[in-house]
A protein has these predicted regions:
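An intracellular "coupling" helix at the cytosolic face of ABC transporter transmembrane type-1 domains
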Residues: 17, 129-140, 192-199, 209-212, ...
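Transmembrane helix-loop-helix hairpins at lipid-water interfaces of multipass membrane proteins
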Residues: 23-84, 147, 151, 157-190, ...
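ABC-fold ATPase nucleotide-binding domain signature/coupling loops
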Residues: 127, 418, 445-474, 569-570
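Cytosolic ends of transmembrane helices, especially the final helix of ABC transmembrane type-1 domains
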Residues: 225, 269, 288-327
Length: 571
């Protein structure tokens, strides 16, 4: 119970933080609409009293004007509230606005989470569940407002019914029990279904993207795997529908059972009211009003328990959002270090999906302005070390210092190719490029000036497609455009032809000023001889280090073996 109360408070705090005016106005309006039926009932009672009195003796017609006018106002206000606020303002305005704002909070949170979490596949399930659960915050807030307004309405109208005949209050209350039982059972079933559907829904969406997205169109054509992908999607879709249909069948049986009980309870109201009217304890107006109040309250009780059921469901469904928002990064302790110096000491790293360390006992000391290369065969741990040095990942053991992401610019091996123009790809994070002249000079320097600046890149159907080498140059231009005191390049020439590789290496050194720390990670050694110092990695360890010329002097060094193997290609 306390847990559900805490979730409710979190939902209210979030809702009021994002849309305070909306929810305050919504509460005030709901309470007003909760009291409004009292006006309708009292006016209808006056009208029926007038009709009954008219059957016995002539009545002044003007006495009917006021109750009819007020009853008309009641009907107009009720209809206007239903049509405008519930169907227009809420469904097509407030909910959409709230969803946009809550997604921005999620996006902000994903930018604050340690990158190590992104290496765990289960993290993406948590992120997906949080995204789906986030809209339930609005629903929880709405349920609480509805609960307050319906409770006020029931209290007011029950008091009104009791003023006619106290016994009616007891009968009306008894009609609420079937609705209560139905909503509790339905809420339990819906919560169970939502939990079962969460993973299936994600899988179904992924399967659908496999057979519809443009990126995989080529492989669908080349390998002819469309029938397989379609069969996988249909299987998941059928599984999704079976879970939904199973719940619908159970709900139908429950509804039929409780509808019968509810019918018996309503019949009891009619019989008791008819008996009191027959023996003369109430007049015709009281009889009709009692029946109207009973039917209205019976519907109100149904709505109340429906809201309670939805509240129970939504407070359960919303938990993944708050669980995701409470994720905290465990940052390693730092050691004292000179300004601008990067130091790793006994650093180890393992991905959440593996028990083995990808990096082991890494010791590095990089001073401001150092130009170093980190080389090794594929799978040596170079890219993981690059992410450690850039601050994207944090060591699982050991200490690190000087990893200031604000001043570090990184060109990752798996850099992003955005469906934007060339200029937008380079000046990424700037809505309007602040330095168009720098973009032009970098484009000329990297031989990508011939790519039109105004065309969307990266889509084969309808937009301009460019080669992998051109994309790599754009990623490098992005790095140089944003500048920084530390430049990290992970496999910067992997898609570049050998004829241009030498020129690109010279450009990299040219862009790194004497005060700039340059770290190049590569399994191609053409650039390592141009840098001051070389670290050689294998199986997650630094096995050799030194200057290029010194490492070549050692006949058994791994670096020399790599160098000779690569240079032999061109002999």
């Amino acid at each position: 119970m306390n847990n559900r109360r805490n979730v409710s408070l979190q939902c209210l705090q979030t809702a009021l933080k994002l849309m305070p005016t909306h929810f305050a106005f919504r509460l005030a309006l709901s309470i007003f609409m909760a009291v409004l039926p009292l006006l309708g009932m009292s006016m209808s009672r006056s009208i029926y009293s007038y009709v009954e009195a008219s059957s016995n003796s002539p009545q002044v017609l003007s006495a009917l004007v006021f109750p009819l006018s007020m009853y008309a106002i009641y009907l107009i206000l009720t209809k206007a509230y239903t049509v405008y606020y519930q169907r227009v303002a809420v469904q097509f305005g407030a909910i959409l606005t709230f969803e946009k704002k809550i997604k921005l909070l999620l996006h902000k949170k994903t930018g604050e989470i340690d990158m190590r979490f992104y290496e765990d596949p289960s993290f993406y399930n948590s992120l997906w569940e949080a995204k789906v659960a986030s809209t339930n915050i609005y629903r929880v807030a709405e349920c609480l407002i509805e609960f307050i307004s319906i409770s006020v309405s029931i209290l007011v109208l029950s008091s009104y019914a009791a003023s006619i005949k106290p016994l009616f209050f007891v009968f009306i209350f008894l009609t609420a029990m079937p609705s209560l039982s139905e909503q509790v059972c339905e809420g339990i079933l819906r919560s169970k279904r939502q939990k079962e559907l969460a993973i299936v829904a994600k899988e179904e969406r992924t399967r659908w993207e496999h057979i519809t997205n443009i990126e995989s169109a080529k492989e669908r054509i080349v390998f002819g795997n469309y029938p397989l992908l379609k069969a996988k999607w249909l299987h998941t879709t059928n599984q999704f529908q079976e879970i939904e249909f199973a719940l619908d069948r159970k709900l139908l049986k429950l509804s039929a059972c409780f509808a019968l009980i509810r019918l018996i309870a309503i019949a009891g109201i009619y019989v008791s009211a008819s008996w009191f009217y027959y023996i003369g304890n109430i007049d015709y107006a009281d009889f009709i009003t009692t029946i109207s109040v009973a039917l209205f309250l019976q519907a109100q009780y149904g709505e109340l328990f429906e809201v309670i059921g939805y509240y129970s469901e939504f407070t359960t469904l919303v938990k993944p959002y708050f669980k995701f928002m409470e994720i905290k990064s465990d940052f390693p302790s730092e050691i004292a270090c000179d300004a601008g110096t990067i130091q790793l000491k006994n650093v180890e790293f393992s991905y959440p999906t593996s028990s083995e360390n990808v990096l082991q006992n890494i010791d590095l000391l990089i001073h401001p302005g150092d130009k170093i290369a980190i080389v090794g065969v594929n799978g040596a741990g170079k890219s993981t070390l690059a992410k450690i040095l850039s601050g994207l990942l944090h060591p699982t053991a050991g200490v690190a210092s000087g990893l200031q992401s604000r001043y570090t610019r990184v060109m990752l091996q798996d850099f992003q190719c955005y469906a934007l123009t060339k200029d937008e790809n380079i000046a990424l994070s700037e809505i309007h490029p602040k330095d168009p002249s720098l973009i032009r000079s970098l484009s000329e320097l990297l031989d990508i000036a011939d790519i039109p600046s105004g065309e969307i890149l990266g889509r084969e159907f309808g937009h301009r497609d460019i080669s992998g080498g051109q994309w790599q140059k754009i990623a490098m231009a992005r790095l140089f455009y944003h500048q920084g005191s530390v430049l990290i390049l992970d496999e910067p020439t992997s898609a570049i032809d050998p004829l241009y590789e030498k020129r690109l290496n010279e450009i990299i050194l040219q862009q790194a000023t004497p005060d700039t720390t340059l770290i190049v990670i590569s399994h191609r050694l053409s650039i390592s001889k141009l840098l001051n110092y070389v670290y050689v990695m294998d199986n997650g360890r630094i096995i050799e280090e030194g200057r290029h010329s010194d490492l070549l002097q050692s006949p058994n060094s791994v670096y020399r073996q790599l160098w000779e193997a690569q240079t032999s290609w061109y002999k």
